[in-house]
Amino acid sequence: MSSKISSLKHKYLRKLERFPFESKEEATRVGVGGCTVGYTRGLVPLETPFSMRSVRGRKEIVVPDAPIQEEYLSSSSSGEDTDSEGFEGDLHLVIDLFVKGKEIIREAPLTIVRGRKYGLVGRNGIGKTTLLKAIRKRRFGIPRGMRIYMIKQDLIVDETVEDFAGAEAGRILNGLGFTKDMAVKNMRDLSGGWRMRAHLAKAINADPDLLLLDEPTNYLDINALSWLEGKIKELKTVIIVSHDRNFLNNTTEMILHLNDLKIDVYRGNYESFVKQRKEKTASARREYESQLLVREHMQSFIDRFRYNAKRASLVQSKIKMLAKMPTLVAPKQDPVIKFTFSSTPAQGALIEFVNVVFSYGCGKVLGGLSMKINSDSRIVVVGANGQGKSTFLKLLAGKLEATEGSIIRAPSLRVGYFAQHHIDHLRVNENVLDFMMKSYTQEEARRALASFGLSVDNQCIGTLSGGQKSRLGFAIINGLSPNLLVLDEPTNHLDMESIDALAEALGRFNGAVVCVSHDLSFISSAFREIYICEDGSIRRFYGDILEYKKGLGV
């Protein structure tokens, strides 16, 4: 019986050899998205010309899993597994991941050890969130018995916060900053940031075997961040996607680096990963240069004695040795990201607050504010959510007027104001360049976009990633040539390389910067003055950001 099956398999393969697809379009015409090869359970890729006659082609067969479609990954209405009973042990996976015809990961072995805390890092758009979704969907042979939870931040439910989070989640909600009054609010009435906190509370309360956290630090203040760092240490296995270096350093013990279709595993936290990767890259570069030198010497010998009869045999030997050597490929260098803010020169005080009070209705938000913003100020404002930090920035930017007191602005003042919600509400179907040309000439628009690494002539705003939208926001304000940058949570959605580029650009900027941020690494690298917003006032903190965090006593 087995010989018959074997014969049928080989007959099938011989037929397949005679029918290579020359293009994806040809495969589509015959209604084929992939061809399953019986004896390997593999999938023949049809994105490029392919034939089973080619040894290289046969190696391209994708073995463990069929392609994963993004729409299928996001079809679940809940982030929690309710039909699983628990799982003891480690996961040993081989990961192949495709989305909409694009290869994300190729045959990458990955072991997830029970009880470990992992950081998943990589550039924007490389597939980190897609990988988390695939794990949530139990691709790669993940057992049904394993309870997996992944927060779906876009899921809005019609119930109170405490009902949504669970009966035992009271202390968790408190740790994340919820008051008793907020805990009885409907989820639909919360801002995106507070909804995310409620999802975090539910996830932690569920105590899954594997918790998947995608950018959990966005919109959390430093108090909540400190609390979450401590709580993660008590959980079971966790995989975290975050661009907050300090948070990853304090929560993770292994780093998964998604890069070049691979998952490289590093022991230690993020800081340790950076050192190890730097050493690995330097070692690869030295090995490449050494091999290049060997080949150059051999080629030089061949060229010199090619027509020397006495050395003919030695030359032929060198030629054969050189031909047998594998193709030498230079180690890939990470592209350098550079941001540039232009400015309008200014000197002295740009803005002065004199006994400023601001109220919403009958409730005073800020009061008694008296301070100056000078042309070289580098100010970061920190404090718990809901204390009035964003309101203060809007007063600076002229988006709000003082209820009492006065705000004196220099005649030369030009403000560039960045807030994430402005970017999120742009028209998704509008072309990026057309949008920029509403305010600038085409040359100015292109220059502003290029200053932040954007070349998106034919792209609509809706197709941009979160990080690209933030860059678009920077490009918009850069076209104004401001001398005061007012930035509300500018690092949300940026990858680490872009955060570094932003910090460096602010360091070179010839003007003042006032920013609200909770990213401790970004604050340390970009700002000299720390102000605390609490109890309706804003006061100077004389110390660094780590001293401020330590003083919270969380």
UniProtKB/Swiss-Prot annotation:
Q: Pfam families, from UniProt? A: ABC_tran, ABC_tran_Xtn
The record's annotation in SUPFAM superfamilies points to: P-loop containing nucleoside triphosphate hydrolases
- Source organism superkingdom: Eukaryota
MF GO annotations: ATP binding; ATP hydrolysis activity
Positions with a binding annotation for ATP: 122-129, 383-390
Sorted alphabetically, which keywords does the UniProt record give? ATP-binding, Nucleotide-binding, Repeat
Domain ABC transporter: residue ranges: 89-285, 351-554
UniProt cross-references to PROSITE patterns, sorted A to Z: ABC_TRANSPORTER_2
Which PANTHER family does the annotation name?
Answer: ATP-BINDING CASSETTE SUB-FAMILY F MEMBER 1, ATP-BINDING TRANSPORT PROTEIN-RELATED
Q: Which family does it belong to?
A: Belongs to the ABC transporter superfamily. ABCF family. EF3 subfamily.
Q: What is this protein called?
A: Probable ATP-binding cassette sub-family F member 3 homolog
Instruction: Specify the species.
Output: Encephalitozoon cuniculi (strain GB-M1)
